[in-house]
Regions:
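Short linear regulatory motifs enriched in tryptophan with gly/pro/ser
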Residues: 1-186
Length: 186
């Protein structure tokens, strides 16, 4: 079995008043038999959250193109990860949101994925070992669809072995923000 160390970066969230001077991250050690739902729980605890909400993991290729969504078990329907876009919508999105220096190959992959999205995955049924770290460009995680606490996840290390229990935080940087802003301070 493989043990993975993932670095989980928390993106700024200006609508909730979270704009830190320094980057906030947690390094989490997890073995390949753990599910994405268990990885979610580890991230949830690492960032000192207390009110449970829906979440989503998205795999991305080396160009940052979303490949597939893995969702909270109660949201899982096994349908497409997102709704299909028609050619006009895809062209408009590429023109407005895709970087000018994106390769034609990346744009074509985006076009194919958006016109025929893959089925979403169930986070409770998908293990870490199901991902190939050599081909996984990036993984993103959004907690609380609505307040949109967005995270970028990158693989730091792998080693042979297994954990005897739950995933663990092995390093951290920066203070975790409050899950909800204090309205009296705004």
């Amino acid at each position: 079995m493989t043990i993975y160390v993932f670095r989980v970066w928390l993106h700024p969230n200006p609508p909730l008043g979270f704009e830190p001077d320094d980057k906030v991250r947690r390094d989490i050690e997890i073995d390949g038999s753990h599910t994405l739902a268990e990885f979610h729980e580890a991230i949830f605890e690492a960032f000192e959250r207390w009110d449970s909400h829906a979440y989503e993991f998205i795999t991305r290729d080396e160009d940052g193109i979303a490949l597939r969504s893995y969702v909270h078990p109660q949201l899982y329907e096994a349908g497409p990860s997102w709704r299909p876009m028609d050619d006009e919508e895809i062209d408009r999105f590429i023109e407005q949101a895709v970087p000018d220096d994106a390769s034609d190959d990346a744009k074509e992959r985006f076009r194919e994925l958006q016109s025929n999205p893959p089925p979403e995955g169930n986070a409770a049924e998908t293990t870490i070992d199901e991902f190939d770290p050599d081909t996984l460009g990036a993984l993103s995680y959004t907690f609380d669809i609505g307040d949109n606490w967005e995270h970028y996840i990158e693989l730091q290390d792998t080693q042979e072995g297994s954990l005897d229990g739950d995933p663990v935080v092995v390093d951290e940087q920066g203070a975790a923000p409050s899950q909800y802003p204090d309205l009296d301070e705004q």
